[in-house]
Swiss-Prot record:
NCBIfam families, per the entry: PRK05077.1
Gene name of the record: frsA
Protein name: Esterase FrsA
Domain of life, source organism: Bacteria
EC number: 3.1.1.1
Reaction equation(s) it catalyzes: a carboxylic ester + H2O = an alcohol + a carboxylate + H(+)
Family: Belongs to the FrsA family.
Keyword tags: Hydrolase, Serine esterase
Transmembrane regions: none
InterPro entries to which the protein is assigned, alphabetical: AB_hydrolase_fold, FrsA, FrsA-like, FrsA_esterase
Pfam families: FrsA-like
Protein task: Catalyzes the hydrolysis of esters.
Source organism per UniProt: Salmonella typhi
UniProt GO molecular function: carboxylesterase activity
């Protein structure tokens, strides 16, 4: 089946699909104060989704393209679940978030198919993949249209990988007690086996969101990157997120001696947001297998255990948490009780001495991850490093932080 035919098959014009903002039915919804963070964007008035401009631009989306798609959504007069929220248009039609971003992606997909130059075609495929992935954002369980967009994002990513520098291998890893999981191994030019970073992404992201991280930071240093979807989404959708949050990554880590392209004696883990929960767990549970663990804006204790901090978090992010935990009908109180069990401090890990070198970067006044969170991680390590990242200029400081973190990882892997 061609890519175009797949698009037509998946997105048949139907209007009965459940609208994204209604998938999680928490009972205590309320208005929240304005909030902004470097890694998550901000909760803009009249939008259900957080608008994550920094990360979308970092992944290669032109700011004007973001505004163009937003404008089409705003201008739609189609029926909405909530008339006060622009991105709640019901059904796959003009004005619907998934429709408009997927339509934008299809334009780039068409350009990719028509482009003769392999490298340029690869760039267009990668861009299409990014846009399909934004269409599927925030990847809530049971969102049929989003899952279809995600399938197209993965397909476009595979097409891009065939044309871009280095090589990418799609790998399947067995996990006892359930379905195998699919990971992507990104390898730089040269002969392996390569030192490798195991990427642990955030709960509202997919494994294909981190190509920029590989291309700009890891590949130039000769480091490979292995990505894996978090439990309950993407290729790991058959696995529920549990208090043993590192389960899937742990099984992949244990299997690396059998992967000929990976130097299993030189492996580090890198965690964004809740991915740091996974990475830090691995630092404790699999210390002999890891040379280092780096975290950025970690979610390992404060947000999971502090009701006051949870009350400042946007509705969409709480919905993401509830969706990942399989608590689609839960009250905020029930969600808080469950989240507390995911705190690595409550689990008795953080605070104990850890032999694995750990770095953690934070932004001051980050609503998701206070300075104390990163400090708790680095002081628990026998070789800890704390990085404060100034907020403005946000893009330049984000780049500087990633360069510093990559240098630190590279030093530990050499």
């Amino acid at each position: 089946m061609t890519q175009a035919n797949l698009s037509e098959t998946l997105f048949k014009p139907r209007f009965k699909h459940t609208e994204t903002s209604t998938l999680v039915r928490r009972f205590n919804r309320g208005s929240q104060p304005p909030m902004q963070s470097a890694l998550d964007g901000k909760n803009v008035p009249h939008w259900y989704r957080m608008i994550n401009r920094l990360m979308w631009i970092w992944r290669g989306v032109d700011p004007r393209e973001i505004l163009d798609v937003q404008a089409r959504i705003v201008m739609s007069d189609a029926e909405r679940t909530d008339d006060d929220l622009y991105d709640t248009v019901i059904g796959y039609r003009g004005g619907n978030w998934i429709y408009e971003w997927a339509k934008q992606a299809m334009d780039w997909q068409q350009k990719a198919c028509q482009e003769q130059d392999a490298m340029r075609s690869g760039r267009y495929w990668l861009h299409a993949s990014t846009l399909y992935n934004i269409a599927a954002y925030p990847h809530l369980k049971g969102d049929e249209l989003a899952e279809q967009a995600q399938a197209l994002a993965n397909r476009a990513y595979e097409e891009a990988a065939q044309r871009l520098p280095g090589s990418l291998r799609e790998m399947e890893f067995a996990v006892p007690g359930g379905s195998p999981v699919t990971a992507f191994l990104h390898m730089p030019k040269g002969d392996g086996p390569f030192p490798t970073v195991l990427m642990c992404g955030g709960l509202d992201a997919m494994q294909i969101d981190y190509y920029t991280l590989y291309e700009r930071y890891f590949a130039p240093r000769g480091i490979a990157m292995l990505t894996l979807d978090m439990p309950s989404v993407g290729f790991s959708s058959k696995w529920k997120l549990t208090q043993d949050s590192s389960l899937l990554h742990q099984h992949v880590l244990k299997a690396l001696p059998n992967v000929p392209w990976v130097d299993h004696t030189r492996v580090a883990a890198f965690g964004f947001r809740f991915g740091a929960n996974v990475a830090v767990r691995l630092a404790y549970l699999e210390a002999p297998r890891l040379k280092a663990v780096a975290c950025l804006g970690p979610v390992v204790h404060a947000l999971l255990s502090d009701p006051q901090r949870q009350s400042t978090v946007p509705e969409m992010y709480l919905d993401v948490l509830a969706s990942r935990l399989g608590m689609h009908d839960a009250s905020d109180e029930a969600l808080r009780v469950e989240l507390n069990r995911y705190s690595l401090k409550v689990q008795g890990l953080l605070g104990r001495r850890c032999p694995t070198p750990m770095l953690s970067g934070f932004w001051k006044n980050d609503p998701f991850s206070p300075e104390e969170e990163s400090r708790l991680i680095t002081t628990s390590s026998s070789d800890g490093k704390l990085i404060e990242i100034p907020f403005n200029p946000v893009y330049r400081n984000f780049d500087h932080a990633l360069q510093e973190i990559t240098d630190w990882i590279n030093h530990r892997l050499c």
